[in-house]
C-alpha cells in the first residue's frame, strides 16, 4: 500500500501491517491536514484532533 505524505506530491510505501492511510486535522481547522501517512489502526478522534482513515492507495 502507498499513502501520501503531508505534501501530496510525495508518498511512501507503507511497512507491513500499516495498511491504512490517514489524515490528521486539528479540530480548530478541518480544512488543512497537519499530518498524513501510514497507520495500523485508525486512532480515535479527540477534543483536539480528528483522524480520517481509508484503505486504498494514496487515498489520503
Swiss-Prot record:
Q: Where in the cell is it found?
A: Secreted; Target cell membrane
Disulfide connectivity?
A: 3-21, 14-38, 42-53, 54-59
* Entry's Gene Ontology cellular component terms: extracellular region; membrane; other organism cell membrane
Question: Which one GO biological process term can you cite for this protein?
Answer: killing of cells of another organism
Question: Is the Membrane keyword given for this protein?
Answer: yes
Q: Which family does it belong to?
A: Belongs to the three-finger toxin family. Short-chain subfamily. Type IA cytotoxin sub-subfamily.
Name the UniProt record assigns to this protein: Cytotoxin KJC3
What's the source species for this entry?
Naja sputatrix (Malayan spitting cobra)
Amino acid at each position: 500500500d502507498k499513502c501520501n505524505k503531508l505534501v501530496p506530491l510525495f508518498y511512501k510505501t507503507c511497512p507491513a501491517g500499516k495498511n491504512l492511510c490517514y489524515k490528521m486535522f486539528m479540530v480548530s481547522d478541518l480544512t488543512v491536514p497537519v499530518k498524513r501517512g501510514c497507520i495500523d489502526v485508525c486512532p480515535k478522534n479527540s477534543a483536539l484532533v480528528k483522524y480520517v482513515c481509508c484503505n486504498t492507495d494514496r487515498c489520503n
